Swiss-Prot record:
This is Mesaconyl-CoA hydratase. SUPFAM superfamilies: Thioesterase/thiol ester dehydrase-isomerase (SSF54637). CDD domains: FkbR2. Keywords: Lyase. The gene is mch. The lineage of its organism: Archaea, Methanobacteriati, Methanobacteriota, Stenosarchaea group, Halobacteria. Belongs to the enoyl-CoA hydratase/isomerase family. It comes from the Archaea. It is an enzyme of class 4 (lyase). GO terms for molecular function: lyase activity. It comes from Haloarcula marismortui (strain ATCC 43049 / DSM 3752 / JCM 8966 / VKM B-1809) (Halobacterium marismortui). InterPro entries: HotDog_dom_sf, MC_hydratase, MC_hydratase_acr, MCH/BMMD. Involved in the methylaspartate cycle. Catalyzes the reversible hydration of mesaconyl-CoA (2-methylfumaryl-CoA) to yield beta-methylmalyl-CoA ((2R,3S)-beta-methylmalyl-CoA). Residues 44-148 form the MaoC-like domain. The keyword Lyase applies. It catalyses: (2R,3S)-beta-methylmalyl-CoA = 2-methylfumaryl-CoA + H2O.
Length: 358
């Protein structure tokens, strides 16, 4: 009987031998299929990253988020931070990255995220602890090989237990066995096209009063406060593969071109939080941001692949002068990221505190 533990029993440098053995070998799988998840299940993810200024600065630099409060201690103090914090986009990506191996490493489509709330500023050196709870599972009527799962996730300080960020996220997840389906219904189309405001208005400046004045003007002119941002960012290897891996996001669709060659996208795709962060950077470059408050109704509409360029568009929805400290007011925006073909790839509502012009 052959001792297959003997190093000389197989010549794995021989192409035919290795190919035959590889075809017969089982694959030790990572991640979970749709059937694994049940409503009410709570998953405690492996200990996550200890947040760093280097990681935050790398994320900010690559995504064009240049707010000096996250780069400079003196500006952070002027903005009423006790210490220079890490950027909230970096925090959110690190919390979500930790969850990927347990929730969505099998692949599937990131459908959206809601109720994103930043509970307090977070500083470098904070160690993360992350849990997710399954809040809903259902069959996809359009793609029977997938199910749809929604989780509520909380990122905490592992040492103090304080909640740092929380959100609700929905993904398509591959099934072990496709579900029976009728294919779903097709919605009716409006042949007359969409109703649009007479005129889009842009704020005259970057402060809270500028957004408030623009909304007041729009109300009298049957107009909307809506504008595009000048900058664009082309997706390169660092954005598509490097940043997800730096936040422990192991989803194959961001770094395995072989696996993705026969997928609908035909290539590796950008991590949704990278696309989102680039779009938000474009928006933040045209405002005097004081603090991020919350995000809602975040959706990802199409693939973003290597070589695509992401641009930003913003609509101002509301201004609240009584929210926040005396030096800022709350503005609610709708942000849209779109590509070089003017195809929307991300949208979401965001409420931020914007500095007053004082």
């Amino acid at each position: 009987m052959t001792d297959w533990a003997d190093p000389d029993a197989l010549d794995l440098s021989d192409g035919e031998t290795f190919d035959s053995l590889l075809d017969r070998a089982d694959t030790r799988e990572k991640g979970h299929f749709f059937e694994f998840f049940a409503e009410g299940d709570e998953l405690a993810h492996d200990p996550g990253l200890r947040l760093t200024h280097h990681g935050s600065e790398q994320w900010m630099g690559q995504t064009l988020n240049h707010d000096p409060a996250y780069w400079r201690a003196d500006t952070a103090r002027e903005r009423d931070f006790e210490e220079r914090p890490v950027h909230p986009d970096y925090l959110l990506a690190c919390v979500m990255g930790i969850t990927v191996e347990d929730l969505s490493e099998k692949g599937g489509y990131f459908l959206g995220r809601d109720d994103v709330t930043f509970h307090q500023p977070v500083t470098a050196g904070t160690p993360l602890s992350v849990t997710s709870t399954v809040v809903d599972t259902k069959t996809s009527s359009s793609r029977p090989q997938y199910g749809i799962v929604t989780w509520e996730t909380e990122g905490r300080d592992r040492e103090t237990g304080e909640t740092l960020v929380s959100y609700r996220r929905t993904n398509m997840i591959p099934r072990r066995e496709p579900a029976a389906t009728d294919g779903g219904a097709v919605g009716e189309q409006d042949e007359d096209g969409p109703m649009l405001p007479d005129t889009p208005i842009s704020p005259d400046g970057e402060y809270f009063e500028d957004f408030q004045a623009a909304l007041e003007r729009a109300d009298t002119e049957n107009a909307a406060v809506a504008y595009r941002h000048e900058r664009g960012r082309t997706m390169d290897d660092q954005l598509v593969a490097g940043l997800p891996l730096a936040t422990l996001n192991t989803a194959r669709q961001h770094h395995n071109r072989d696996e993705m060659a026969d997928s609908p996208s035909g290539d590796i795709v950008a991590y949704g939080d990278v696309t989102r962060s680039v779009a938000l950077a474009h928006a933040r470059s045209d405002e005097a941001t004081y603090r991020e408050r919350r995000f809602a109704d975040e959706q990802f509409h199409d693939f973003v692949t290597l070589g695509d360029t992401v641009y930003g568009f913003t609509r101002v929805l509301d201004c609240d002068p009584d929210a926040g400290p005396e030096r800022a007011g709350a503005v609610t925006f709708e942000h849209v990221a779109f590509n070089q073909d003017q195809t929307p790839v991300y949208s979401g509502r965001r409420t931020a505190l914007i500095q007053r012009d004082t």
